[in-house]
């Protein structure tokens, strides 16, 4: 691959990732979701994984600790997330969804699925599989673990 091709493909990848996030943020804002995209990622991961430490959650949502702390503070204030003492380590805590948080995830999940479908609406299954294969290869080239 030439330097120009590499620059062009890198630009396209970055531009597309930014557009997907921008579109999602616009939909969240105009759709009265009461959470941001980043807050949703936290809620979704807590919903799928149960009790997590802040470090475990940070790794899942790719956020540093100060950023995640701010997000968690807001979600706790809204009543969606609760910090509970860790059963084995009194110095730390675990995070979990409250009943209100579970209800929020249940209510938002179908709406968010519709937002995600927008990006893929004109792609065939074969396009999607090839795209996934290429992204997985790039991710692994940079030291990431393969995801299912």
Identify the role of each PLM range.
Residues 1-5, 126-148:
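C-terminal regulatory/oligomerization modules of transcriptional regulators
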């Amino acid at each position: 691959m030439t330097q120009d091709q590499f620059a062009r493909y890198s630009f396209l990848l970055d531009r597309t990732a930014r557009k997907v996030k921008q579109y999602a943020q616009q939909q969240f804002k105009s759709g009265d979701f009461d959470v941001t995209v980043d807050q949703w990622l936290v809620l979704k991961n807590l919903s799928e994984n149960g009790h997590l430490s802040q470090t475990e959650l940070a790794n899942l949502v790719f956020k540093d600790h100060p950023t995640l702390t701010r997000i968690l503070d807001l979600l706790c204030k809204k009543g969606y997330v609760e910090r509970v003492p860790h059963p084995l380590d009194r110095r730390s805590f675990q995070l979990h969804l409250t009943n209100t948080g579970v209800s929020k995830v249940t209510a938002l999940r179908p709406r968010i699925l519709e937002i995600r479908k927008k990006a893929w609406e004109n792609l065939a299954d074969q396009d999607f599989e090839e795209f996934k294969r290429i992204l997985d290869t790039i991710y692994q080239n940079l030291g990431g673990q393969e995801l299912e």
